[in-house]
Amino acid sequence: IKLSGMVGESKTDILNLAGPVAKQWIEPFITLTKNAHNLDAQLESAMQAMNSAQLSFPIVAKPDLGCRGVGVKLLKSKAQLRDYLQTFPASARFLLQRKAPYQAEAGVFYVRYPGQEQGKIISITLKYAPSVVGDGTHTLKELIERCPRAGQLTHLYFPRHTQKLDWVPAEG
C-alpha cells in the first residue's frame, strides 16, 4: 500500500490485497469509473455490473479515494444510483458495495516495518457513525452542533444535510 493506507489511498487496491481469511469479512463490491459517455448508458452499464456481481439495492456507493465518509451514500434505487452518477466527478473511480449488516465498521491498524517478515496489529477500533436524537425543539443543525462527536465535524455534516439543517426532528 503506497501511503500505508492513509488518506488518498485506493479502497479497491487495499481491499484487493486482503488474504483469504480477511476477504470473508469484506462485503462484495465492484469498482466503476465515471466517464464522459451518456449518463443513461453509464447507468445501464452499472446495473449490468451489479447484476453480474449479484449485487442489489440497497447498496453503498463510495469514492475509491476518500476520507471520513465524504461521498459515501446508501442508494436504495436505480434512480438514486443515477443521481449519484450525475454528481460524481468525471474520470473518478467509485465502488458499489453490498451494505454490511452491522452497525459499526472495524478499523484495524497493522504495521510491518521494512525488513521485517511479519508485522503486528497495534490498534483495533469499532467506528460508529454519529447520530443525533430529535427532541421536538432543536433543529438538525443545532442537534449536530450539540453532539460531542458530530459537533467536531460540522464541516462534513452540514454540507451533507444542507436541505434538512432547519428541520426540527420529532422527539425520540
Regions found by a protein language model. Name each.
Residues 10-165:
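Active-site nucleotide/adenylate-binding loops and adjacent lid/helix of ATP-dependent enzymes
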Residues 165-172:
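Contiguous C-terminal substrate-recognition/catalytic subdomains in enzyme active sites
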